[in-house]
A protein has these predicted regions:
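Nucleotide-activated sugar donor-binding and catalytic core shared by glycosyltransferases
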Residues: 1-234, 244-382
């Protein structure tokens, strides 16, 4: 008797989603009839293609090309084109991760009565100005099964009234991703290629909408970057998102000579640069998880997040990183302190939610377990 596998569609749209889901995608390819879709929300070689290659991922089955002339058009395209794709492919379930506009494909799946599984559910920074916070709240309450990174996230969802019986803590997928590529990360020759010395540079990544598009935040952050170069007299390697580069060029901002703008780096190169940096200064959501993992592996690095809020309280609980705010004074204080702490041997505690290296297996099993339950209990199918 031939048994057909469950048909799953996974929708991604940005580099962080591709990275976080990389090991999950491989498991889904193995155990499901898996259809991988890229919305094209952020698509160019540096931001996506290089990561598919670096993470040993196959190409998506379909690109939706949702980028429009305005934010409203792009969001509309995500919903409309994912609706058409879902209706044509007819998957048994949809998997999405995170809080980008690509996750709004959950709206289309819900209208088509397709069970929605949402990874990274329940993250909250409680800053209503951020578009990601809006997306999180929408998708968490649309999803049929929420897969959280931490007990913090599960408690937030429970307090908001989501179904307790369909909310699970899987842990962060980043430990599994980093573990899978650990030898290549450690063995990268990126320092030689960029003529950098271990501990002799700062690594910078800043691309969030609130930091780049807001004029006041942009000015404060860029002034802080130049202040870092002046204070430490070390190269500041800025891994620059194309959108950030465009905004910087439009404003005609001039960097200190020690600030080196660089196109987005590969996953393995960037993480090698993190583990060898004097300090990492970033607004990336993965910074707390990466810092926690490297600390647990015996390769701690000073990590400063240039934001005023975080959706990773479980990492802040354990001292895995420091919120540096955006003002020059606060950023310099945070860098000084984290560097001094590492020099003094003051280590962060282990973050339990960031240690599991079998998150992909958990996700696959939960999807297999709950698709038919959602069909029956929510949609009254069968």
């Amino acid at each position: 008797m031939t048994v057909q596998k469950l048909k799953l569609m996974t929708i991604v749209g940005t580099r962080p989603e591709v990275i976080r889901l990389s090991e999950v995608i491989k498991k889904c390819d193995r155990y499901f009839d898996h259809y991988l879709v890229h919305t094209g929300q952020n698509y160019d070689y540096e931001l996506n293609q290089i990561f598919f290659e670096d993470l040993d991922l196959r190409q998506p089955d379909e690109y939706l090309d949702v980028a429009g002339g305005s934010l409203g058009e792009s969001i509309g395209n995500v919903i409309a084109r994912s609706y058409d794709c879902l209706r044509r492919v007819r998957p048994d379930a949809l998997l999405i991760l995170g809080d980008t506009n690509s996750c709004l494909s959950a709206i289309a799946a819900k209208r088509l009565h397709i069970p929605v599984f949402h990874m990274e559910a329940g993250n909250r920074c409680f800053d209503e100005c951020l578009p990601e916070e809006t997306n999180r709240r929408i998708v968490d309450h649309i999803a049929d099964v929420n897969l959280c990174y931490s007990e913090h996230a599960r408690r937030y969802l429970n307090a908001e009234g989501t179904a307790r019986e369909r909310t699970y803590v899987t842990g962060s997928p980043m430990a599994e991703v980093l573990s899978a590529h650990w030898d290549r990360i450690v063995g990268s020759d990126v320092l030689d290629r960029l003529d950098l010395q271990k501990g002799g540079y700062l690594l910078l990544s800043a691309h969030r909408e609130e930091n780049i598009d807001d004029e006041g935040n942009f000015k404060a952050l860029m002034e802080a970057v130049n202040a870092l170069a002046r204070r430490y007299e070390l190269p500041v390697l800025y891994s620059m998102h194309p959108r950030s580069r465009k905004r910087i060029e439009e404003r005609g901002f001039s960097f200190h000579p020690l600030v080196r703008a660089h196109k987005p780096l590969s996953f393995t190169d960037y993480n090698n640069l993190q583990m060898n940096a004097f300090c990492v200064v970033s607004d990336s959501g993965t910074l707390p998880e990466e810092a926690a993992y490297f600390n647990a592996k015996g390769h701690p690095f000073p990590a400063v997040c240039v934001r005023t809020s975080t959706e990773r309280p479980e990492a802040l609980d354990k001292g895995a990183f420091v919120l540096g705010s955006l003002t020059t004074e606060r950023v310099l204080q945070a860098v000084d302190m984290t560097v001094a702490m590492l020099s003094d041997g003051v280590a962060a505690s282990v973050v339990p939610d960031y240690r599991d290296e079998n998150v992909s297996a958990k996700v696959v099993r939960i999807i297999q377990s709950y698709t038919s339950i959602v069909d029956k209990m929510v949609w009254r199918k069968g």
